[in-house]
Amino acid sequence: VTHTYIQGTGEFKAGFFPFRLFSGRALIVVFSLILATALIWFLSMARVADLGSGSNLASSGLIELWKHGDVVVMIRHAERCDRSPNRCLGSADGITVNGSQAASDVGAGLQRLGLERAHLIASPLTRTQQTATYIAGQTVISQDWVGNCDTHFKNEVVGHKTKGENLILITHSGCIDHFERTMGVPAGERSSEYAEAFFVKMDGKSIPRVLGSLNAVQWKSLANDQLK
């Protein structure tokens, strides 16, 4: 409320400040700030690119980073026997025959990418051990932390990454999910298929960066020159 003095009367006349105009402008400013904040938050979220689609593999920089040993790849175990009607490879706590073929396909793809500067570690569970064997073509060492899917998983990954050597982990969807959460990957993108590979840049100089993922089938569709 404002008060205006009226000459000749000795009286004050009450009036109202134009709150409607002020409020309208204030709302626009507040709305703009909210929109800008939401946009910044959206753009800051890590995205998991489909490296088997279009030019995503080339634009990710994965190949060059792999040559320098600056990549961590987390691979979910192949199809579980106890959750599938397909024929089991062996015991019920392992993978299926179809899963072993998928793991072999992933292994062939990694061979084309190059395993000279790579270190493989698997979770000790049967399904991850079998998957790792078919990926590598031989027995792979196991360590408990690779199967401990909790909030400390990312720190364990960072701590076990050696400079100049790619790290390949045969693990579980829960572990990959925990890692993605700490990287800011939105819930709708935090999923991994059987034998899907999730790639992260980890060079020891900058913060880890999500590069993208490849499922088991996509490895076959990649030409040799795309992996060199």
Show the residue positions of the predicted features:
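Active-site-proximal alpha-helix that buttresses catalytic centers in soluble enzyme cores
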Residues: T2-D144, C149-H152, H160, I176-H178, ...
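Generic beta-sheet signal
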Residues: V71-V72, K163-T171
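Flexible acidic/His/Gly-enriched loops in nucleotide-sugar-dependent glycosyltransferase catalytic domains
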Residues: N155
